[in-house]
């Protein structure tokens, strides 16, 4: 099929419908299995890194059958992201939001999930959800680590170039999650960091 591209945009093409449908038909995904011990091991490895003491401890569980090109391996199934998160006792993941819907399955630990000002306590084997673009924060209030699975429709939104993230809370931190947009991902506050920040706030109030 001949076509002209006088303006010189090499990524802009016209193709025959048959070729288009060849691209639409993808390979099916194979069944996958991820051992819980391996997931925990990955989280513990992050925990050993001193640079991660105040970072979000998070591993993504991916299927290499999912996605194409640069989006290959961004989901556990087409459209869905799955990860596992570790929060230490006394730590807080401060308020943030994203336009992906989130589902959480608590494996270990106790604490609180705050969504738009409403506080919900959690314990092992609870299932919790957070609507899209809702501010939410986590606090591990128990004496054991919090371990939880997190499932988002993030992979679908990323593929559509429609994923937005605000972290930490503040309109200046809203990011369109595409290349060239700076993202902020590290937002777990260690207890001692929280106290330091609180002291700074008191000093500001006294000025």
Swiss-Prot record:
Keywords linked to the UniProt accession: Dioxygenase, Oxidoreductase
Cupin type-2 domain: residues covered: 85-151
EC id: 1.13.11.64
InterPro entries xref list: Cupin_2 (IPR013096), GDO-like (IPR047183), RmlC-like_jellyroll (IPR014710), RmlC_Cupin_sf (IPR011051)
Superkingdom of the source species: Bacteria
Keyword Oxidoreductase: yes
Transmembrane intervals: none
Catalysed conversion reaction: 5-nitrosalicylate + O2 = 2-oxo-3-(5-oxofuran-2-ylidene)propanoate + nitrite + H(+)
Entry GO MF terms: dioxygenase activity
Protein purpose: Dioxygenase that catalyzes the cleavage of the aromatic ring of 5-nitrosalicylate (5NSA) without prior removal of the nitro group in biodegradation of 5-nitroanthranilate.
Name of this protein: 5-nitrosalicylic acid 1,2-dioxygenase
Organism expressing this protein natively: Bradyrhizobium sp
Designated gene of the protein: naaB
């Amino acid at each position: 099929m001949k076509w002209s591209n006088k303006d010189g945009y090499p990524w802009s093409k016209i193709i025959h419908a048959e070729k288009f449908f060849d691209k639409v038909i993808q390979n099916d995904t194979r069944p996958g299995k991820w051992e819980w011990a391996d997931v925990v091991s990955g989280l513990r490895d992050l925990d050993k890194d001193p640079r991660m003491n105040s970072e979000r401890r998070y591993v993504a569980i991916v299927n290499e059958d999912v996605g194409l090109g640069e989006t290959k391996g961004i989901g556990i199934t087409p459209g869905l992201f799955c990860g596992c998160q570790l929060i230490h006792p006394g730590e807080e993941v401060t308020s943030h939001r994203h336009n992906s819907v989130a589902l959480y399955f608590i494996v270990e630990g106790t604490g609180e999930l705050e969504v738009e000002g409403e506080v919900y306590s959690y314990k092992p084997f609870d299932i919790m959800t957070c609507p899209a673009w809702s501010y939410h924060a986590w606090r591990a209030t128990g004496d054991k680590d919090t371990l939880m699975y997190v499932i988002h429709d993030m992979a679908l939104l990323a593929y559509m170039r429609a994923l937005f993230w605000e972290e930490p809370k503040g309109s200046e931190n809203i990011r369109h999650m595409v290349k060239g947009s700076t993202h902020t991902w590290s937002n777990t506050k260690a207890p001692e960091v929280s106290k330091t920040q609180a002291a700074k706030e008191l000093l500001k109030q006294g000025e």
